[in-house]
Amino acid sequence: MGVNKKLRPEHFSVEYFRNFKEVSFELGRKITVISGQNGVGKSNLLSLIASGSGLNKKSVLGSNFQPEFYEFFNVDEDEDFESYKLYLTYVEDDGTPALTKRLSFKDDTKTGRGIRIIPRTSNIYIDNCTLKQAEINAKNEYDVGGAARVKIPTIYLSLSRLYPLGERKDTVKITEIRKKNAFYQRKADEKYKEWYNVVIPNSIKSEAVLSKVEKGACARASLHMDINNTPTLSQSIGQDNLGNIISALIDIYMLSMDDEYNGALLC
């Protein structure tokens, strides 16, 4: 960012998106919980929120910090996507309004990228300000271009994380991580054990080693440490799901050691 100001999403407004009309809610400083019955679009909302920010940088596990909506959800050419109106407002750490992005949809099916989201700077909530001026302010104050993401490292954990390890063993690849790897150098193994054992006490022994798990059905690789009395491919969905969430937190933990780190977003 231009002056290294820390930004965070503070408000999400959905004027129109599929079955959502005139829906808006605040986003918490540290955590936001979206609840509801199955099939209403909760995962869609989370992925939309993740589409306004990102960083074109690889994590230690190989995934990037810039999730694309079309990688997880399909927008059909027959949809009225040009009429969708969604706005994400970002504030500085002290709550000072910073900028708003309209999540617009662009048809890139001819280039094989599908219909994807472009976060465009908007002047919707700024009195007496032209769109051009809003774009200039966002660029000068926060180094955010008119059609660019807000520079917050972002991870979206899709529901593919719930795919059971043992259901399709032939699509799962498990590789032990060497002791010289950055994960061990930065004590990520200790963090993994600590966080996992806080949720499910006495699950991972001190001598357990880190492995990298790649599922054919999941875009993100994850970390794994053997659980007491439970072979890797025999983990429950809940145990594996917890491991996936902690893996994402480890990605952020590793990123936090960079001098320029200024927060991250996990959806």
Predicted feature locations:
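P-loop NTPase switch/coupling surface
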Residues: 1-170, 180, 188
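Short, charged low-complexity intrinsically disordered segments located at boundaries
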Residues: 75-84, 223-229, 267
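Extended helical coiled-coil dimerization/tether regions that scaffold
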Residues: 1-3, 155, 159-243, 247-264
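Hydrophobic positions in the central parallel beta-sheet of the AAA+
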Residues: 12, 264-266
